[in-house]
């Protein structure tokens, strides 16, 4: 487990997708704004809760000493900036009660913390996770292609829908169904919604590629490195569901303009993984805190130029699609 978790960090920083769909969407500038910069409101609402800022540090790691070091850096950044942090899958701690890589309130007691578990795990383990972590919400991740590419991965999937229904009805905190960089299709969202899930992180292709990571760990299926749909493609495909479910976006988000494009396409909030991981691995924590705080001001600047006071108003912004996105239905 430890080596696999460390491999994930190592290879996540190496791969760069040859295509980023955010470059194929262009927002229409407004020349006569209605609001002052000081009027702009970054707050958002999802999973039954209000949040001051519309982006969060998404699930990445844990379960090793390297993972602990990364998590502690991320926790300090999240606490200092007031954004939510989601830990990586809690499965390592369930297997090893001595694992302390998730005990992040000891690092930052004011941390807004959520956590993550795989849908292959029965609901009893999800309940244990919530009891031990006391998270704001629980992400339940689906990663079928990653599992199939892992020599030690799961091969039994018929229980997943049953597990999901049980998570939706038996977990005492909000449950978010999360992809892991392959993108979530509309039919899966509809099915999960029917099973009781209201909030989805569609986590599209464009950032961390677990197909690439598993291939680097010894696989030979590099032709699957770019499997799945991009975040923008998933958001476009899910337009008809935006009034029925809550959509969060992650995957390939590089900067505040990419975040804004997600909000324009209906996302309630945006998760960042690799972008933040690169920062904490490259810079001192204080500088990363300054960068993340800077993102808040940059979001306000872009929103002001788009004549939008709130995140919700961004859904009314006009945009142009180019390249591959012109083919998305």
Curated annotation (Swiss-Prot):
Record-listed E.C. numbers: 5.3.3.2
In this chain, Mg(2+) is annotated as bound at 147
| CDD domains per the UniProt record, alphabetical | IDI-2_FMN (cd02811)
Question: Which reactions is this enzyme annotated as catalysing?
Answer: isopentenyl diphosphate = dimethylallyl diphosphate
Primary localization class, coarse: cytoplasm
Which GO terms are recorded in the biological process aspect for this UniProt protein? isoprenoid biosynthetic process
Provide the binding site for FMN.
59-61, 89, 116, 178, 203, 208, 252-254, 273-274
A molecular function (GO) held by this record is: magnesium ion binding
Judging by the UniProt lineage, the source's domain of life is Bacteria
**Where on this chain does substrate bind?**
4-5, 146
Keywords annotated in UniProt: Cytoplasm, Flavoprotein, FMN, Isomerase, Isoprene biosynthesis, Magnesium, Metal-binding, NADP
Gene3D superfamilies, per the entry: Aldolase class I (3.20.20.70)
**What cofactor does its activity depend on?**
FMN; NADPH; Mg(2+)
- What PANTHER family does the record tag this protein with? ISOPENTENYL-DIPHOSPHATE DELTA-ISOMERASE
Query: Which HAMAP family does UniProt cross-reference here?
Result: Idi_2 (MF_00354)
Assembly information from the UniProt record: Homooctamer. Dimer of tetramers.
What's the protein name?
Isopentenyl-diphosphate delta-isomerase
Q: Native species of this protein? A: Streptococcus pyogenes serotype M1
The taxonomy runs: Bacteria, Bacillati, Bacillota, Bacilli, Lactobacillales
Q: Which gene encodes it?
A: fni
